[in-house]
């Protein structure tokens, strides 16, 4: 399992009430126990991270992903955003507006050259039940020296651009927190890049930003 240190920047989307949408057409959620979950045979562990001292598996949910063909899309262009927004408003749409990204269930609606496409990932620690996250096209990096930011931008030119910064590294025990927009195509690529950055000696931690639709049965 690739280790990505988990910080304090997981974004939770409270999307209550969306689970009844027929787009998702999946069985009603049952009380989860790992011992009796038949879908575990379909799971393929890819990556993970630490939450404090606890290791957390991040697993592509192959069973639902292959059966329903659901992908989460972050459009990169304004025209694409308008197109997906228009599709999501159609009565028989297979595109669901999730507020910042789109859940797409029909392949012809997500095969483009520009979108960032995330698989849905199973996360193994939330309340003992299966919960899901999608990977955002953003990587958050914590460093103690602000010069590291420039080294990262130079090494990953074309893949990362600086979006925002915070922190007070000049204070005793201080740090800098940088948010980089990630110009890649897939969640797997973003996770691998975050893992690579985390392995640097001059980086305290790095992770992809995530959305956790914990109130949506997907």
Where are the predicted features?
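Positively charged n-region of N-terminal signal peptides that target proteins for export
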Residues: 1-4, 19
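Sec-dependent signal peptide hydrophobic core
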Residues: 5-10
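C-terminal motif of bacterial Sec signal peptides marking the signal peptidase cleavage site
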Residues: 14-17
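Primarily auto-inhibitory N-terminal propeptides
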Residues: 23-218
